[in-house]
Swiss-Prot record:
Protein name per UniProt: Pyrimidine-specific ribonucleoside hydrolase RihA
Active-site residues from the entry: 240
Gene Ontology cellular component list: cytosol
Matches recorded under Pfam families: IU_nuc_hydro
Gene name linked to the record: rihA
Enzyme class label: hydrolase
Entry-linked InterPro entries: I/U_nuclsd_hydro_CS, Inosine/uridine_hydrolase_dom, IUNH, Pyrim_hydro_RihA, Ribo_hydro-like
Source organism of this protein record: Shigella flexneri
């Protein structure tokens, strides 16, 4: 039986590819998709969800737009990474359908209530919508199997020296998620910076030759350009968000540890830092499965295999 998931995302090139991977995988049943503000403004990320589902001919999936700003802060966006539209590069179709006439939290709650079994929430943007859901619907916590997030890092940040972008945008929301008591899986920069797509991988995807694989290759063409900056020291571009979906599909490709994680919300230099108690120094009981490594070639092979679904 397919695993029911609810995807909360802020497309974003890597979010878009996470959507592609999830919808090409019969092991997963995508119940709904909600949009968060982060990689671009809330209007643009919602539009990008609709554009991707139009491309994939999955306009049957309910979509709703989320919070327009973080819980306690002004919104920061990553337009320097993802471009003016949030999905610069390929020519994507205009949406052929509209979002639901409700908020992201309302759609999430409805999805959880109506599901016969607990739902896995996959969140690949800031955690604002998920935190709002947890705070406003404590009666539905038991309907959440786990929360798989792309965010954080045990080590170096990518937005500040200490903080990864998704957590930095709304650290208060991320702290609510980590301390919720619901199982959390964290795909942070420790693993996603190892899940790099090289130029030759992009050409492999392009050679598959269907419209979706071509779009994915064109998304990666744009994404690779940003990551050529020598400061990163990358061979390719880290494909952050699809790591969440890939872990659900093939956990054997990944190495994980069970640790306690907290989020710094006030530090002068460390706002948005995920503090991972790797050496069990706090005495706190582990609250997260932290993904720390990936079989890069296996990850690329999985993407290539699933892109053939769209032939």
């Amino acid at each position: 039986m397919a695993l029911p998931i609810l995807l909360d995302c802020d497309p974003g090139h890597d979010d878009a590819i996470a959507i592609v991977l999830a919808l090409a995988s019969p092991e997963l049943d995508v119940k709904a998709i909600t949009s968060s503000a982060g990689n671009q403004t809330p209007e643009k990320t919602l539009r990008n969800v609709l554009r991707m589902l139009t491309l994939l001919n999955r306009t049957d999936i309910p979509v709703a737009g989320g919070a327009v700003k973080p819980l306690m802060r002004e919104l920061i966006i990553a337009d320097n990474v993802h471009g003016e539209s949030g999905l610069d590069g390929p020519a994507l179709p205009e949406p052929t359908f509209a979002p639901q006439n409700c908020t992201a939290v309302e759609l999430m709650a409805k999805t959880l209530r109506e599901s016969a079994e607990p739902v896995t929430i996959v969140s690949t943007g800031p955690q604002t919508n998920v935190a709002l859901l947890l705070n406003s619907h404590p009666e539905l916590h038991s309907k959440i199997a786990r929360i798989v997030i792309m965010g954080g890092a045990m080590g170096l940040g990518n937005w500040t020296p200490a903080a990864e972008f998704n957590i930095y945008v709304d650290p208060e929301a991320a702290e609510i998620v980590f301390q919720s008591g619901i199982p959390v899986v964290m795909a942070g920069l420790d693993v996603t910076h190892k899940a790099q797509i090289h130029v030759e991988d992009t050409e492999r995807f392009r050679a598959i030759g269907n419209p979706v694989s071509t779009i994915v290759a064109e998304l990666l063409d744009f994404f690779l350009e940003y990551h050529k900056d020598e400061k990163w020291g990358f061979v390719g571009a880290p494909l952050h968000d699809p790591c969440t979906i890939a872990w659900l599909l093939k956990p054997e490709l990944f190495t994980t540890v069970e640790r306690w994680v907290g989020v710094e919300t006030q530090g002068k230099y460390t706002q948005g830092m995920t503090v991972v108690d790797y050496y069990y120094l706090t005495g706190n009981k582990p609250n997260a499965t932290v993904i720390v490594d990936v079989d890069r070639q296996g990850f690329v092979d999985l993407l290539a295999d699933r892109l053939k679904f769209y032939a």
